[in-house]
Structures are given as structure tokens and as C-alpha cells.
């Protein structure tokens, strides 16, 4: 018989940087999960992607065991990395802070496609371009 699920926890943690400090510790502690065990497993799985923010969905079972699934980094983080920026514009309609090329958008869309709700690569590219516009990043053709 399958284990009974008691909850899901969604977090965004730096790759290889999970530790018991907030926000990870309190979120896992509320569900009774072994915090250090999660941190060790997460850090081992994500150490190759150092420096990126990794979304993770943790499934917690009644016996306090857990499984987790890592997702691709958020589009905003990937766009900032490609554009070489620290953060997006506070006023994207007025202040443009950087540029990315169509090729860079396509590369990000290919990486994000499994996590996006798009039928094809073109739809995924449109979503990435919308994120870029909302951050004050200009797309060069």
C-alpha cells in the first residue's frame, strides 16, 4: 500500500546551499521532517548547479519520510544571468536595465520547457520574453 501524503512544501533554495536556518528549517520542522537529512540530499543533488536558485517541491508522508523534486531555476534568475544583471528594473515601463538576444531567450526557453505550460518552444519563448519585458530587459532581434 502506498504511503499517505500529509503535505507538500514548496521552497526556492540556492543550489548546494540548503541549511537548517530559515526559511528551510521552520518550513520542514512544521511537518516533522528530518531537516539535516533533507539538507544533505538536496545539497548532494544540486551541487553541480551552484549559484542558481532551485525550486523544490517536498512531499511529506505520515511516517515523516519525504521525497522531493527539483525544478528548473526561475526564468527571472536565468534572464538576469544571461543579461549580466544583479536585479531587474523597478520601473520596467520607463527604465530599461539590460538586453538579451533572441538566441539567449531560445536557450532559456529550451531549459525551462519541461516546467512551463507551453505546447511548443515558440510558446515557451513568448513566456520568457514576457518575463523579460516585466523586468525591464529589452529583447534584441
UniProtKB/Swiss-Prot annotation:
Record's GO cellular component terms? cytosolic large ribosomal subunit
For the keyword Calcium, the answer is: no
Gene Ontology biological process: translation
User: Which Pfam families does the protein's record reference?
Assistant: Ribosomal_L11, Ribosomal_L11_N
Q: Which InterPro entries match?
A: Ribosomal_uL11, Ribosomal_uL11_bac-typ, Ribosomal_uL11_C, Ribosomal_uL11_C_sf, Ribosomal_uL11_N, Ribosomal_uL11_N_sf
One function term, GO molecular function aspect? structural constituent of ribosome
Keywords linked to the UniProt accession = Methylation, Ribonucleoprotein, Ribosomal protein, RNA-binding, rRNA-binding
Record SMART domains? RL11
Q: Which modifications occur after translation, per UniProt?
A: One or more lysine residues are methylated.
Binding partners and assembly: Part of the ribosomal stalk of the 50S ribosomal subunit. Interacts with L10 and the large rRNA to form the base of the stalk. L10 forms an elongated spine to which L12 dimers bind in a sequential fashion forming a multimeric L10(L12)X complex.
Q: What does this protein do?
A: Forms part of the ribosomal stalk which helps the ribosome interact with GTP-bound translation factors.
PANTHER family (alphabetical): 60S RIBOSOMAL PROTEIN L12, LARGE RIBOSOMAL SUBUNIT PROTEIN UL11M
Q: Which family does it belong to?
A: Belongs to the universal ribosomal protein uL11 family.
Alphabetical list of HAMAP family matching this protein: Ribosomal_uL11
- State the name under which the record lists this protein: Large ribosomal subunit protein uL11
Q: Which organism is it from?
A: Chlorobium phaeovibrioides (strain DSM 265 / 1930)
Amino acid at each position: 500500500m502506498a504511503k499517505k501524503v500529509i503535505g507538500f512544501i514548496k521552497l526556492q533554495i540556492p543550489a548546494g546551499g540548503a541549511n537548517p536556518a530559515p526559511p528551510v528549517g521552520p518550513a520542514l520542522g512544521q511537518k516533522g521532517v528530518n531537516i539535516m537529512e533533507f539538507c544533505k540530499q538536496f545539497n548532494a543533488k544540486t551541487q553541480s548547479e551552484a549559484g542558481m536558485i532551485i525550486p523544490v517541491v517536498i512531499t511529506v508522508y505520515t511516517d515523516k519520510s519525504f521525497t522531493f523534486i527539483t525544478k528548473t531555476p526561475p526564468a527571472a534568475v536565468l534572464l538576469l544571468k544571461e543579461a549580466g544583471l544583479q536585479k531587474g528594473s523597478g520601473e520596467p515601463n520607463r527604465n530599461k536595465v539590460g538586453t538579451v538576444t533572441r538566441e539567449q531567450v531560445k536557450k532559456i526557453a529550451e531549459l525551462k520547457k519541461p516546467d512551463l505550460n507551453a505546447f511548443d518552444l515558440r510558446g515557451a519563448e513568448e513566456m520568457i520574453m514576457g518575463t523579460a519585458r516585466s523586468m525591464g530587459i529589452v529583447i534584441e532581434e
